[in-house]
A protein has these predicted regions:
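Ligand-binding loop in jelly-roll beta-barrel domains
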Residues: 67, 80-103
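Generic protein-terminus/edge-of-domain signal
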Residues: 1-71, 82, 88, 123
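Double-stranded beta-helix
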Residues: 102-121
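Short hydrophobic beta-strand segments that form the core of ligand-binding sensory/regulatory domains
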Residues: 50-52, 75, 85, 94-98, ...
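Short, Lys/Arg-enriched, Trp-marked, Pro/Gly-tolerant hinge/linker segments that flank
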Residues: 117-130, 143-202
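Amphipathic, well-ordered alpha-helical segments in soluble domains
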Residues: 50-53, 132-139, 156, 163
Length: 203
């Protein structure tokens, strides 16, 4: 029986996540971004949690002294409303995962010359939220107050990556009607653009 193929970008992220979860020994410390620093020059802040994974090279967060150099396998978790000032001073391959309420956003950066570059690959995938992802994200947000508890934090992040792999490796549910798909698309658009001014052209 022939396996159903995923779209190319989705398959790329499925393979990337498989490489991470099947080789957990390559994953290192989990760092946490801080809230309340979104006014800093160059800062990036989101309404939803985000996880950055350094696949190769060096990356960093200029807002926190101990996070200015993150190396291969290290991760930066940003709770909702937390901010970071990304550092792309050296070559780096970076996976960034955004956890929105009804969809998962994945971005792959390959900065060969030590400077910020547009995302090479980017997908947004709807997912049925049954509570497991929200529970893990909430636990990580609480654990940001005690970042030294890596023996608890790292297995939790590995579980979160397993969940991401499951979502990315799955095709959309066959029973999704046109109306449901349209509703999900509208929700995604509102979540991304609710703070922008609304006009006929922007819609």
């Amino acid at each position: 029986m022939r396996a159903t193929l995923l779209p190319a970008d989705q398959q790329f992220f499925a393979d990337l996540l498989s490489g991470l979860v099947l080789n957990p020994q390559q994953l290192g410390r989990v760092w946490f971004a801080q809230r309340g620093a979104s006014d800093a020059v160059g800062s990036v802040s989101r309404d939803w949690p985000r996880l950055d994974v350094v696949l190769r090279g060096e990356y960093g967060n200029r807002l926190v002294a101990g996070q200015q150099i993150l190396r291969h396998g290290e991760m930066l978790f940003l709770p909702a409303q937390a901010a970071s000032v990304p550092v792309f001073e050296r070559p780096v391959m970076l996976l960034s995962i955004l956890f929105a309420p009804s969809w998962l956003g994945l971005v792959f950066h390959d900065s060969r010359h030590g400077q910020s570059v547009p995302a090479q690959r980017h997908v947004e995938l709807p997912h049925p939220e049954r509570g497991e992802c929200a529970a893990m994200l909430m636990a990580l947000t609480h654990l940001s107050a005690s970042p030294q508890d890596q023996a608890i934090i790292q297995p939790l992040v590995l579980s979160l990556l397993h969940w991401c792999r499951k979502v990315v490796s799955s095709l959309p549910e066959p029973g999704l009607s046109r109306g449901d798909f349209l509703y999900q698309s509208i929700c995604n658009w509102v979540q991304e653009n609710y703070a922008e001014s609304l006009s006929r052209e922007s819609v």
